[in-house]
Amino acid sequence: MLSLVLIFMSVQLRLVGSEDTVASLLRHQAALASMGNRRHYQPAQPLLTGSRLSGHGWPRKVLGLYVLLADDTEKGFESDAVWTPELYDWQKSAANVLFFTFIHPATMEIPPAFVSLAASRGTNKNGAVPADTLIIFAIGGYAYSLDPNPWHWLLSREAAERMAEKVATWPATFGCDGVDLDLEEGAGQHPEAGRNLIHFIRRLKQLQPGLIVSQPAYGYPQVPAETEVINASWDTEGHSNNLADSVGLMVYYSTFALNYVKNYAQGASQWEGFPVTVNVPTNKILLGAHGQTSSADIHLLATETLRQDLLGIMVWYASVKNGFQYASSWDASTNNDSIQGYLQAMSLFRG
């Protein structure tokens, strides 16, 4: 049913001329795509692990999986639940980046599941993270942008910078290589959120210059805080201002993400009043992919990534071996065709 709705919407997007209508349809698509998607979580016990921060940033080409590790609505997998996640073998081979989902923005505490899986990196134990795989901690998400709203640490510059000082300790304490700032509708529309998120990133980069900061965004830019971060992170020539390191397109159906690259790569040359006013370098843009995207569509996303010199592909979502699921039809881990597609894409990226 979801696929039929999205197909219908895709046809509509080709027909409508109104930007308001396009924005409305994309908002609805994003809501559908976030079924079970961005949900609730909570705290954890700190555990000292090694950091891999080297200042080198993203791999040349990324295949990143959003893996489900904590959700306060899933019994036994709440943010404070103590359990030991294990990766599938295919995830270790197909991905060079893992996005751990999600940290609750009200607490900004690290779930024990994050700590456990991050600490496994390079140990070669069953289900462990490979030594050369990057770990990105995702903050917020769709549900956590609706509640809490606003995020308390984005209400002032002082609060944002204090939170940056806390987050700057995460690489050494928990072993992450970056953060994914998934501030969506709701808290992302709060009038002070964008400028204070910029203060947060700037302070974070002062303290941890090598920390990766990824900024997800809808295909059509419609969350003001996300757009403010993107506009502050680059200029019209594509030069970096040392804030966000990438933009991830939250367009997950088929290969549709390719249709929205121009909204960011050529933002400065869109129509007058367009929300994005800068040109994001193509090699800083990640294409969104539904977990169960067909291998043929994954191949097209991968070849276009190479042809257009895009950063890579981010996949929503993949369950871990002993974890939980949202809608099974979105789970990459239960579709052999998709798994083969991601393995082949990584082979292409590695050359």
Q: Model-predicted segments: where are they?
A:
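N-terminal, immediately post-signal peptide pro-regions of secreted/luminal proteins
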Residues: G17-Q45
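Extracellular/luminal ectodomains of metazoan preproproteins built from arrays
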Residues: Y41, S51-R52, G351
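Cleavable N-terminal signal peptides of Sec/SRP-targeted secreted and luminal proteins
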Residues: L2-R14
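Substrate-binding cleft of secreted/luminal carbohydrate-active enzymes
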Residues: L286-G351
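Chitinase-like catalytic core of GlcNAc-active glycosidases
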Residues: L47-W271, T282-L286, S294-H299, F324-D331
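Conserved catalytic cores and adjacent C-terminal regulatory segments
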Residues: E272-T277
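Low-complexity intrinsically disordered segments
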Residues: L4-L6, S18, P46, P130
